Amino acid sequence: MRRTNRAWLRVVSGLAVLSLAGVAMTPSTAEACGGTFCDGGVPGPMPVDQSGENVIFVIGDTESEVHIQITIDPNTNAENFGWLVPLMAVPEFSVGSQPLFDQIRAASVPQYDITTTFEACGEPELDSGGFDPTAPATSSAGDSTDGATGTGDGPTVLLEEAVGAFQVAVLQDTEVGPIKKWLEDNGYLWDAKAEPILMEYLAEGNVIAALKLRRSTTINDVHPITLRYPASETCFPLRLTRIAAVDDMDIRVFVLAESRAAPTNFKHVLVNPLKIDWLNRATNYKQVITNAVDAFEANGRAFVTEFAGASSVVNTAAIYGPSWDENDFVGLDPVLAVQTLNNQGLGACYESFDCTWNHPLVYGMLLEFLPPPQGVDPADFYANLGTYAADIDVSKWDMGKGFAAGMLERVIEPGIHGEALIKTWPYLTRMYTTISPNEMMEDPIFHVNASLADVPALRTAQNYRLCNGDSVVTLPGGDEFYIPGGGPWPAIPGEEWWAEEVQTVTVKGAPMTIVNNTAAITKKRVEWNLDHNWPREPGAESSDSSESSGASGANGEGGCGCRSGEGSLGLGLGVFAMLGLRRRRGGVRAGGASVSRR
């Protein structure tokens, strides 16, 4: 059922700083399980770095969901991955869809573009043929046990099951000690800094979900996890993250609902667009957002809205394909396995060509159920299965039964569900912040407000090149800014405001402004323009109309600056967010730019 504006969900998630030592293994030094996040190949300008932590929330009347993206640093041992999630109730766990994350991110990534025109200067202008001379060369930017079990000195184990690549247990106790002992007995390496924070959650009535990768699982098998529950409140606490978080950690929250979402107990910030380097298509984006959310009254606990609009922008064809069918693999000759994947659109692996897989889990399942013989290159093996027919391990293939079951659980069912979410929930909101450990003192809550306006992902400025070599850039909101020499992007002396507005957003109606720097910013901008004789005195303009260069933002692939998580703790840190419901309001600026009303 669709939710109404009176339905409420509070989603809270947290990661304790624990690593896996392995039950029958010699304990090793805990390794950092960070991650790399990069949306490559997005058409058009994409200057915004997309590394960081990502969570999708789905808000419903009777059932709610949180989708958690888990990415492990490829330079670490995947077996040393451990994760704790405090929850208000025992959820239903399932395999999540990485393509759902990929497509939601690609459809909503904020983009900054600039179109250049030239003043007519009395001589024929050379057509730049779409090349902007001011632009940079590229834009940057299983088996389960259900029910309570336990011993007198241990926690109550409410649930144990295998979920895709993960082994999951849900623990309940009123004290940290029994949970700590259970974790250590089951191969988790305890971090003492987690104890007081975990106790806070136990005192609040939370149960603790513990996740670790199943034995023999590799990094190729890692996938998102979905938690689904019939509850009005559940939790994803940010407080646990501070144990091992880095300064200015990126957090990106996506909400699928009926209307636009906004932060409840965190502030909402409109970024000063003069701080964005439009000429270089916002290569300074993260620094601008970091400074804006650290501004007066935002205090390091605020979000900007990067996109808000119809969820139909998401390409569902890349989330699930109707040709995907696990039954095709049951009883299949293993020599035909790759050909069948090709036919279903899940692979493109042919002799004399590199093999590519159109779902991130296909390759890992092939390695598990149809491994190449020792010493044989996997790409050569999978492209030439007929040649290696006599060397295939038919016992592992087992008539394709395990592969088919894996296809259903890890690829097909998550894909069907992901596609259904986009088609069921008409609105997508994307919010972003950076936050440091000393700021992680409360868990962010979100709600839906039907009064809030759409926020486009693409922001375009106009660059008017003057005959004297200077430029006038018109920002998306219509404000003009004089650029001496046509660049670089100047900083106005004394114009120190990174946030144009700091707001609180209620359940209904327009946001309430706490800080409004618009007048001060405008005053400094106008004074700057006048100091540079802009606008011109009457009669000083060129008598000819301007000529368009046809230039626009670079259309190369985005230079997404991916990076691996760092640190000495064997725990992939996830986003911790709490979520509520409400509705939508009028136009705002998002991600540092004025946006049009719809």
Language-model-detected regions and their locations in the chain:
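Surface-exposed, glycine/proline- and aromatic-rich loop segments on solvent-exposed faces
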Residues: 49-120, 179-205, 209
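Sec/Tat signal peptide C-region and signal peptidase I cleavage site
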Residues: 23-32
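Long alpha-helical, hydrophobic tracts
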Residues: 129-221
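Accessory, solvent-exposed terminal regions and/or long lumenal/extracellular loops of proteins
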Residues: 36-49, 190-541
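A cross-kingdom signal targeting lumenal/periplasmic-facing segments of multi-pass membrane
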Residues: 91, 95-163, 360-362, 366-377, ...
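Ser/Thr-rich, Pro/Gly/Ala-heavy low-complexity intrinsically disordered linkers and tails
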Residues: 138-140, 144-151, 541-577, 585-597
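Bacterial N-terminal signal peptides
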Residues: 12-24, 574-578
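Bacterial N-terminal signal peptides that target proteins for export
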Residues: 2-16, 564-569, 584-588
